[in-house]
């Protein structure tokens, strides 16, 4: 008779609190922690705050009116949830690379199963559909569908993550052009005094994200090379990739400043030029330090700083 190993949860009378895929027992608390890790909460802050910044560009202090505030919070939640869904899809497709690059991710530690992640994605999409139905804005819905489309082609098929240039582009377009379009569409793209405001902001943010996305590839260099993924880090090396990030970061901020000078985007954006020294100093520091940790977090903080400072300086 084969030996039957009894789960510690059952020994303690806690069997009802665990899920046991493939004979391995995962307590509910670890599943919850795994779901939180799956969503990568820190990366959800940027799209949530970006929604408020774009809305402020259009409405100014009108964002604090109850109706507008509720609308913005709902849209911001939709964008943040969509980013969480994108993170989950990416982790489903990156199991091979994550065993090398990110062994602490929930699918690798077996805190979650692939079925758990797929279930989360399905429920997340149902919530997105509910939000789109409540908002009833076809342009916003198209923007959300577009962002989801790019998430799928980046991670699944044709998996542009492995294709040079296309990997950065398929992240920059949804987070830059489409993210801005989603919020502008709620209040009317031409609601601002200058009809080119959306285009200017969206292009500048897209350039910023296109360059900044390289920072996440530094830590993943080893696994990406083994998986045949071609990006700026695996093709040119960390130092040259960081130089490119510095140039693109500076380009986006200079572009915003020029557009502000000619009143195409809010005047306050021209003061973003003061962030250039910060960009270069940090980028060059990381380049020569050859650090593989922390820079992706810096990108998100820097991105939020650019957006928030621009909003605060709106009336200057």
Show which residues each predicted segment covers.
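Multi-pass alpha-helical membrane architecture of UbiA-family
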Residues: 2-316
